[in-house]
Amino acid sequence: LDALRALGREHAKTHPNALKERTAAVSPDDLAILVYTSGTTGKPKGAMHAHKGLVYTVRGYNTLIARDDNDECMCFLPLCHIAERMGGEYFSLYTGAKLNFVENPETVPENVREIAPTVFTAVPRVWEKFYSGVMIALKEASATQQAAYAWAIGVGQRVADLVLAGKEVPAGLRLQFRIARALVLDNVRKLIGIHRSRFLVTGAAPISPELVRWYLA
């Protein structure tokens, strides 16, 4: 990366107006990328994406899930998919967030724990795998630990239900939730690697409402 930056600095010395010239040569309606569909319903089709469409989407996304250069994200879905191009690559370019690339698909759980992303986007199958990992660890825990988890997740789900219903969480339940997080739930988040996450995003396929409720808890 340092060598690449050095090449860029040298190029800038001999071509000081290169960026302005290249920007001026492109219009918002020009083709930015060509992304092929998966081919599940027929032959793969090349979807044309103009610059204005990509910029409009990224700006809109940032109003809902605001990122900045303090955020860390992960890239593990194929870049041939528009979801990873937009939510990972282009969104990080737009906001300055750090984009970490996983070593390979098999190391995703390990890399999540290592990086602890602040914004994490994944398909439902990944969220299901993380949940299954927690359940497997729970089976190997002591009876006391299992009882503590059952109480803590119950408190968290009561809070989640009230929040989803737009209702106020009573002071007593808020206190219980703080205790549940300190004793149990924060450790579950660390086990997955989402203890720093401000936003968890899912898409591309249906996800179980109960699984969403569990993560909210």
Model-based region annotation:
Residues F120, A180-A217:
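Conserved AMP-binding/adenylate-forming
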